[in-house]
């Protein structure tokens, strides 16, 4: 029988949520006021990733940030991260009971209705909806959702979970994404590939959270 008790809660609105692939980016962005962030490193063994995970968690604690570790849930549990983010394929192998018992928050990626229903049944801390627009930062097996589909999913959830929109969201697309009622916007290249990442981050913080960096 599936344990339907909820995972540890997080803020209803997570605000700006950068997803980055290095400890260097974690430190830069926490240093300019970002409060929710995800370390997404790929194609490394747990042994190879552990040092980065430890350093990222330490930075999250230092800056009192909501730091999520993508995929490496065993390391996140071992080193007491704030939270873990899992894709649908990760849900097949992760020990969700161990993550919950450790008190970690859980975020889950979804791409269409069936995956959204699966996420709701798990009762995670937040649900990510995407990808909204075409993106080059990750190979995606599904088509972009678009704003109409995002709006429908937000309405279907009826505020039961914090929500995060992700995928191809540039600065100029932020107002339209926020208008759907989503509680957070995850970005990758809008910051990491910006000509001036500091300015891009400050602009995004003001647009999404209404505060200065």
From Swiss-Prot:
GO terms for molecular function: magnesium ion binding; thiamine-phosphate diphosphorylase activity. Its cofactor is Mg(2+). It catalyses: 2-[(2R,5Z)-2-carboxy-4-methylthiazol-5(2H)-ylidene]ethyl phosphate + 4-amino-2-methyl-5-(diphosphooxymethyl)pyrimidine + 2 H(+) = thiamine phosphate + CO2 + diphosphate; 2-(2-carboxy-4-methylthiazol-5-yl)ethyl phosphate + 4-amino-2-methyl-5-(diphosphooxymethyl)pyrimidine + 2 H(+) = thiamine phosphate + CO2 + diphosphate; 4-methyl-5-(2-phosphooxyethyl)-thiazole + 4-amino-2-methyl-5-(diphosphooxymethyl)pyrimidine + H(+) = thiamine phosphate + diphosphate. Pathway: Cofactor biosynthesis; thiamine diphosphate biosynthesis; thiamine phosphate from 4-amino-2-methyl-5-diphosphomethylpyrimidine and 4-methyl-5-(2-phosphoethyl)-thiazole: step 1/1. Binds 1 Mg(2+) ion per subunit. GO terms for cellular component: cytoplasm. GO terms for biological process: thiamine biosynthetic process; thiamine diphosphate biosynthetic process. 4-amino-2-methyl-5-(diphosphooxymethyl)pyrimidine binds at residues 38-42, 70, 109, 138. Mg(2+) binds at residues 71, 90. It holds the Pfam family TMP-TENI. Keywords: Magnesium, Metal-binding, Thiamine biosynthesis, Transferase. CDD domains: TMP_TenI (cd00564). It is an enzyme of class 2 (transferase). InterPro entries: Aldolase_TIM (IPR013785), ThiamineP_synth_sf (IPR036206), ThiamineP_synth_TenI (IPR022998), TMP_synthase (IPR034291). 2-[(2R,5Z)-2-carboxy-4-methylthiazol-5(2H)-ylidene]ethyl phosphate binds at residues 135-137, 168, 188-189. Its EC number is 2.5.1.3. Condenses 4-methyl-5-(beta-hydroxyethyl)thiazole monophosphate (THZ-P) and 2-methyl-4-amino-5-hydroxymethyl pyrimidine pyrophosphate (HMP-PP) to form thiamine monophosphate (TMP). Belongs to the thiamine-phosphate synthase family. This is Thiamine-phosphate synthase. It comes from Pectobacterium atrosepticum (strain SCRI 1043 / ATCC BAA-672). The gene is thiE.
């Amino acid at each position: 029988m599936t344990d339907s008790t909820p995972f540890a809660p997080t803020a209803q609105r997570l605000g700006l949520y950068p997803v980055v692939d290095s400890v260097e980016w974690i430190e830069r962005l926490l240093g300019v006021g970002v409060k929710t962030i995800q370390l997404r490193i790929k194609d490394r063994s747990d042994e190879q990733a552990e040092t980065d995970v430890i350093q990222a968690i330490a930075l999250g604690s230092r800056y009192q940030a909501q730091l999520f570790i993508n995929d490496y849930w065993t390391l996140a549990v071992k080193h007491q991260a704030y939270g873990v983010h899992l894709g649908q394929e990760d849900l097949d192998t992760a020990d969700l009971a161990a993550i919950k018992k450790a008190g970690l928050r859980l975020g889950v990626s979804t791409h269409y209705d069936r995956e959204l229903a699966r996420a709701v049944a798990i009762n995670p801390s937040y649900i990510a909806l995407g990808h909204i627009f075409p993106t080059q930062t990750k190979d995606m097996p599904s088509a972009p959702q678009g704003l109409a589909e995002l709006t429908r999913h937000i309405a279907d959830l009826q505020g039961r979970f914090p929500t995060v929109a992700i995928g191809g969201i540039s600065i100029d697309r932020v107002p339209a994404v926020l208008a759907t009622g989503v509680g957070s916007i995850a970005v990758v290249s809008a910051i990491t590939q910006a000509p001036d990442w500091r300015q891009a981050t400050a602009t995004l913080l003001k647009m999404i959270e209404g505060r200065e960096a």
